[in-house]
C-alpha cells in the first residue's frame, strides 16, 4: 500500500501481544495480561521496571521513527509551484479478528478517528460509494478504547489530517488477498486525499496542482 501511494511506511515490527505501540505507554493494556480471555504468560506479573524496559525497546523507537519521518516530510524543501501544497496525511493501518469473545463483528473495514474527522469522513464516503465493503465508523474500537493514541500524538498535535483503518483479518489471509486489499485501500486513500485537496484548494484542483503524499504508519496487530 505504501509503495502504491509512494508514501513512507513506519512499522512497529512487533506483535501487540508483546507491546501495543498504539496505546499510551502508561495504559495497562499497552502490555496486555490477557487477550479475549486467554492469558499471555509473558505479560503476567511484570514489574514497573520490566514494563519500562519493554516500552523503551518497542514503543519509544517506533514513535521516534514516526516523528522523525513526519518532521522530515514537513521540513523538506519544495520546488516553487503556482498552487498551494497540502500537508501530509497520517494513515495508520491495523487488522481485527472476525469474531471476538464469541461475537461476530459485522463489518469489513473500520475507519477510526479522534477529534479530527476530516480524512476519516472522506474515507468513509469513498468506501461507501464503492459499495463492495461494509464499513463502520470508530469500530470495532474507538477513541474510548485508547486506540487513537498514535493519531493524537502525531496527527492531532501537529494539525495533520489523519485516520486509522482496521481491516478484518480474514480478508488479508494470503499474499494475493493482501495485495488486493492494499490496492483497494491505496485507491480509497488517494481518492479521499484528492477530495480533501479539492475542498481546500478548488482552483488548484481544477488546474491539476501537485499535492503531497500520505504517510502510512502501522503498529503490528
Task: Write out the residue ranges for each language-model feature.
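N-terminal catalytic or cofactor-binding beta/alpha core of small enzyme domains
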Residues: 1-90, 95-221
Amino acid at each position: 500500500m505504501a509503495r502504491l501511494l509512494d508514501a513512507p511506511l513506519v512499522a512497529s515490527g512487533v506483535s501487540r501481544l508483546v507491546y501495543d505501540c498504539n496505546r499510551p505507554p502508561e495504559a495497562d493494556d499497552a502490555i496486555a495480561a490477557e487477550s479475549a480471555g486467554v492469558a499471555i504468560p509473558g505479560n503476567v506479573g511484570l514489574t514497573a521496571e520490566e514494563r519500562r524496559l519493554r516500552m523503551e525497546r518497542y514503543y519509544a523507537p517506533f514513535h521516534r521513527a514516526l516523528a522523525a519521518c513526519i518532521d522530515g516530510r514537513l521540513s523538506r524543501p519544495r520546488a516553487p509551484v503556482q498552487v498551494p501544497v497540502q500537508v501530509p496525511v497520517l494513515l495508520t493501518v491495523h487488522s481485527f479478528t472476525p469474531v471476538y469473545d464469541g461475537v461476530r463483528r459485522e463489518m469489513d473495514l473500520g475507519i477510526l478517528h479522534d477529534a479530527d474527522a476530516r480524512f476519516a469522513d472522506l474515507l468513509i464516503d469513498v468506501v461507501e460509494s464503492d459499495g463492495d465493503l461494509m464499513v463502520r465508523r470508530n469500530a470495532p474500537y474507538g477513541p474510548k478504547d485508547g486506540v487513537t493514541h498514535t493519531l493524537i500524538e502525531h496527527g492531532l498535535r501537529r494539525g495533520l489530517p489523519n485516520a486509522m483503518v482496521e481491516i478484518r483479518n480474514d480478508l488479508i489471509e494470503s499474499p494475493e488477498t493482501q495485495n488486493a486489499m492494499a490496492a483497494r485501500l491505496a485507491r480509497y486513500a488517494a481518492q479521499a486525499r484528492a477530495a480533501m485537496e479539492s475542498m481546500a484548494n478548488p482552483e488548484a484542483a481544477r488546474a491539476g496542482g501537485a499535492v503531497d503524499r500520505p504517510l502510512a504508519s502501522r503498529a503490528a496487530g
